[in-house]
Structures are given as C-alpha cells and as structure tokens.
C-alpha cells in the first residue's frame, strides 16, 4: 500500500504515465460528479465519489486494477496485508476483479487530502468510525492503456 500526502505530491511522483495523469484529471473533475455515479475512460479507469461509513468484514484483493482512494473529508483506518498471509474466503472472480480473504494485517490511518494506492499483491479492508468522503478510482495495471484518449 502506498500513501501519498497530497495531490501535488502524487503529481510529482507520477508525472510520467498517462494512466496516473488521467487519475489527476478525474480527481479534478469531482465537482461534476454526483455521489455514487461511476464514470469511466474505457475499461482502463473508472472513478466515483462515495461517502462511506461501513467497516469491511473481509479483506478485498484485486488482480487487474489498482484501487486508488483520494480522501476529500474525514479520516479512515485501513488494514492491509500481503495476500499470501491471508486465508481465502471467496476465490477470485474475473468478472468482478475481486477476491475476499480473512486474517490480520497492519493498520494505518489516512485523512483528508491523502491518496492511497492499493497494490495488487495486497488485500485491504476499510474501517470506519465516522463517514468519509472520497474519490475511488480503479486503474488498470496494464502498460498499454488509454491509446484513444
């Protein structure tokens, strides 16, 4: 899991790479996004604004997409662990790009302005004590992306 302190730092770290630039464009478009409505750029990037106050019971893992969270309001704990240290509860489904696991991991707390990138070799679960508002992006892991954009 990568935690980046703010959007400017994200821009500097990921200055090259079209898919990361598209993430910044999506985040900058949040004033035009209704909560809960998903938008996409082909199948290489999807994004939505959500307000979340639920705690995940299980860890979630992905294989084809990084999950990126940009926090707009509030703070949230995230428990994460390498997938190989967790026990599979529901096997990976290609249709959803998800697998569910259980176990114990390391916990971090993130807050407004920070960006979290969930790596595909790890699984994570979000722990909420209060509602958080964030932009959730799913970004392809593939190198060949956004050819027509």
UniProtKB/Swiss-Prot annotation:
Heterooctamer of 4 alpha and 4 beta subunits. The lineage of its organism: Bacteria, Pseudomonadati, Pseudomonadota, Gammaproteobacteria, Enterobacterales. It comes from Escherichia coli (strain K12). This is Evolved beta-galactosidase subunit beta. SUPFAM superfamilies: Clavaminate synthase-like (SSF51197). One of its GO terms (cellular component) is cytosol. Coiled coil: none annotated. One of its GO terms (biological process) is single-species biofilm formation. Required for full activity of the EbgA enzyme. Exact function not known.
């Amino acid at each position: 899991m990568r935690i980046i302190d703010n959007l400017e730092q994200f821009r500097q770290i990921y200055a090259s790479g079209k898919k990361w630039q598209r993430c910044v464009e999506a985040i900058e478009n949040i004033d035009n996004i209704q909560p809960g409505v998903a938008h996409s750029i082909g199948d290489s990037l999807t994004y939505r604004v959500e307000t979340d106050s639920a705690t995940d019971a299980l860890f979630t893992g992905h294989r084809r997409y990084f999950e990126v969270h940009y926090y707009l309001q509030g703070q949230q704990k995230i428990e994460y662990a390498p997938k190989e240290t967790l026990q599979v509860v529901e096997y990976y489904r290609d249709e959803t790009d998800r697998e569910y696991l259980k176990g114990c991991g390391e916990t971090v707390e993130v807050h407004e302005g920070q960006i979290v990138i969930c790596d595909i070799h790890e699984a994570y679960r979000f722990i909420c004590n209060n509602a958080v508002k964030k932009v959730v992006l799913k970004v392809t892991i593939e190198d060949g992306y956004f050819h027509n954009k």
